[in-house]
A protein has these predicted regions:
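Transmembrane beta-strands of outer-membrane beta-barrel pores
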Residues: 72-78, 87, 121, 132-138, ...
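Gram-negative outer-membrane beta-barrel transporters
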Residues: 127, 132-136, 155-251, 353-357
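Signature of Gram-negative outer-membrane beta-barrel scaffolds
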Residues: 1-63, 100
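Hydrophobic, lipid-facing positions within transmembrane beta-strands of outer-membrane proteins
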Residues: 52-58, 101, 111-115, 165-169, ...
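Residue-level signature of outer-membrane beta-barrel architecture
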Residues: 50, 58-61, 74, 107, ...
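Membrane-embedded beta-barrel scaffold of Gram-negative outer-membrane proteins
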Residues: 61-77, 83-85, 95, 104-167, ...
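Short sequence motifs at beta-strands and strand-loop junctions characteristic
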Residues: 44-52, 106-109, 159-165, 210-216, ...
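C-terminal beta-signal and adjacent terminal beta-strands/loops
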Residues: 239-265, 279-280, 309-358
Length: 358
């Protein structure tokens, strides 16, 4: 043991704490020079934290029908330990030189501010809510699977800081005695504002948007109720829109696409956004040098649903068709994969719902 007292301080040695950590000497060296921070872990391998989070709100009734409010709130996700903590990257070149899987992904914290309005207008026929918000995230936790460069196991790390800001609006309108309209819309702007040094050239650059955060999404619904044959009948229809977004915080899409081509002889067919710069240190098979720092694009999607129903006494029945146009609406899931995999919306689905109340 090159570091006297380490075995005693950490209850039998670093090897017992960092299973799968590779070279014991390398792990000890990383602890000594500060690349692996174990200050939050006690001799039993337990991480404990104490803190206070705040939530405060203030509202003001402008009239009987309109209220405005403000909210300040804080949140957090607790720290998490990595089972392959202390493992040096298998690739010790370029941006990976000296990289070590962290012992702990630190607690990430959130500060949120909201200003909004809740209202009932048009003699109670219209309910309208609007809220604007801004959120700051410090030490954002992310998971990563990078077997080509770091380790075969998924691990957690703190990528840096981020900001989000947006506006949400929802409404319900009694357009007539029979017709009800409802809907919601959300505008979202996100940005990665700081990147930890060890992730430069691995994560997407500062200024990039956060993954799976479409700038615009919304829905609108209509329902028409009427009496028929001694019971209650209705028609309903809905449209749901989800704007385009990107997947993942690591800029590994071009690298994964190259792996896809070598493994299966074909591309995934999913669009890629170049975020600027290059990713990693392994050149692509096309002979064009390092792959670009890039992410997969999840295209926007619009789905439509319709239904017709009837209820009488204790029985109700509804015939429905969801996703009429069989919109694919795929979302790429890059985490924990060598090649891109996608989840998709359920295709056009028709069915009959029956219920009985007693």
């Amino acid at each position: 043991n090159n570091y006297p007292g380490a075995a005693d301080t950490y209850g039998g040695g670093v090897k017992e704490m960092f299973r799968g950590g590779g070279s014991n000497a390398a792990t000890l060296a990383a602890i000594q020079d500060g690349r692996v921070d174990i200050s939050s872990i006690d001799k039993n391998g337990v991480t404990k934290e104490d803190d206070v989070i705040i939530r405060a709100s203030l509202d003001y009734q402008l009239s009987d029908d309109i209220m405005i409010y403000g909210v300040y709130s804080e949140g957090y996700r607790p720290a998490t330990q990595n089972r392959n903590a202390g493992q040096l990257a298998t690739n010790q070149t370029g941006v990976y030189e000296g990289y070590v899987v962290p012992a702990v992904a630190k607690t990430d914290t959130l500060e949120n501010m909201e200003i909004g309005m809740k209202s009932e207008l048009m003699d109670g026929r219209l309910r309208l809510n609007v809220v604007g918000y801004q959120t700051e995230i410090t030490d954002l936790q992310v998971s990563r699977f990078d077997p080509s460069n770091v380790a075969f196991l998924v691990f957690m790390e703190n990528v840096g800081d981020a900001e989000t800001r947006g506006i949400d609006m929802d409404f319900v309108l009694m357009a007539s005695a029979n017709l009800t309209l409802a809907g919601a819309v959300s505008y979202l702007d996100t940005e990665l504002t700081r990147i930890n040094d060890q992730l430069q050239g691995v994560a997407v650059p500062v200024g990039s948007e956060l993954p799976l955060s479409p700038s615009l999404s919304g829905n609108i619904r209509a329902r028409y109720d009427f009496s028929w044959n001694g019971g209650d009948a209705w028609f309903n229809a809905a449209m749901v829109y989800r704007g385009s977004s990107v997947s993942g915080i690591a800029g590994s899409a071009a690298f994964m696409e190259d792996t896809q081509g070598m493994a299966y002889g074909t591309s995934s067919g999913v669009s890629i956004r170049n975020e600027g710069g290059t990713f990693g240190t392994i050149e692509g098979s096309n002979g064009l040098g390092l792959p670009s720092n890039s992410r997969y694009i999840n295209d926007s999607a619009l789905s439509m649903n319709v239904g017709v129903g009837y209820g009488r006494d204790n029985w109700t029945a509804e015939l429905y068709v969801n996703n009429i146009t069989s919109e694919e609406g795929y979302v790429v899931q890059p985490a924990g994969k060598y090649t891109p995999e996608s989840s998709m919306m359920r295709p056009r689905t028709m069915g009959l719902r029956l219920s009985y109340s007693f």
